[in-house]
Amino acid sequence: MKKVRSFVSGLLFLLIGVVIVVFVLNLFVKQQPQPKPQSEKVEEKQAIHLVAIGDSLTKGVGDSQRNGGYVSRIRSKLTTLDTVKNVTTENFGVPGERSDEILDRIKTDSEIKKEVTAADMVILTAGGNDIVQTIKKEKLSVSEKSFDHALEAYRENLKEMLQQISVYNPKAHIYVYGLYNPYAAYFPDLKEMQTLLIEWNTSTETIIKHQPLATFLPIDIIFNGTDRLNNQSTTTDADDAETVVENPYLYEEDLFHPNDAGYEKMAEVLFQAIQKNE
């Protein structure tokens, strides 16, 4: 009987000891400084390399600062984003070039290939000189039919441009500006030109819809839509008292290329598209 009591007493003492040890350990653990939960990782800022290829709109003809038109302006806009570390740009704009000439440079210019390969995004302007040179060639005999061949050639050239850029860099997003009618404010009765521009822009947009990582940038709505109507001014010719409407987004020297305000609008359209896609 004494042995049983001794065994029970020893077991009870052991259990009490275990409880005390567990209590002390638990108290010690609670007193230790708990690691603070990790705060959300700050998103790493991105360095952006933008390559612009095209005609006089890419070169920036009409920009009073002679600083690359929409290219310098989109660089400034992108650097305001919290997620962007820095922005570098390359401008391969050549005034007067048709779409076939731009395509040839994309395919053969080693500098363009190098920059496109390293680009995060590529911006294109093309097609305007295809129309202008067709008008110059046909002169007084020009008609809607005159542009059929030029439009078909433009379509094929644009497809090849997109394909070649994608070969150089399949991850780069391509943005393609549409065309605008510079004559709408000054020759509102010239409906054929607006019809022609709509057809070309529709063709461009259709091609881009079938191209991965490509976005169409419509700008005719800026140069000739309600935005222009709300900001345009008028002047009166002293000789014949004729009222002339002035487009606030066109360069006064030629009334064809964008001015500073026009390039700012082009950059804004591109900026909004980039924010949506990137």
Where is each model-derived feature located?
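Substrate-gating cap/lid alpha-helix
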Residues: 13, 182-221
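Surface-exposed cleft-lining segments at the edges of enzyme active sites
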Residues: 95-99, 131, 138-153, 185-193
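Histidine-centered active-site loop/cap adjacent to the catalytic His
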Residues: 241-278
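Hydrophobic membrane-insertion alpha-helices, especially the h-region
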Residues: 9-26
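Oxyanion-hole/transition-state-stabilizing segment in secreted/luminal serine hydrolases
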Residues: 104-149
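Mobile gating loops/cap/lid regions near enzyme active sites that modulate substrate access
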Residues: 221-253
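Serine-esterase "nucleophile elbow" of acetyl-processing enzymes
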Residues: 29-93, 112-114
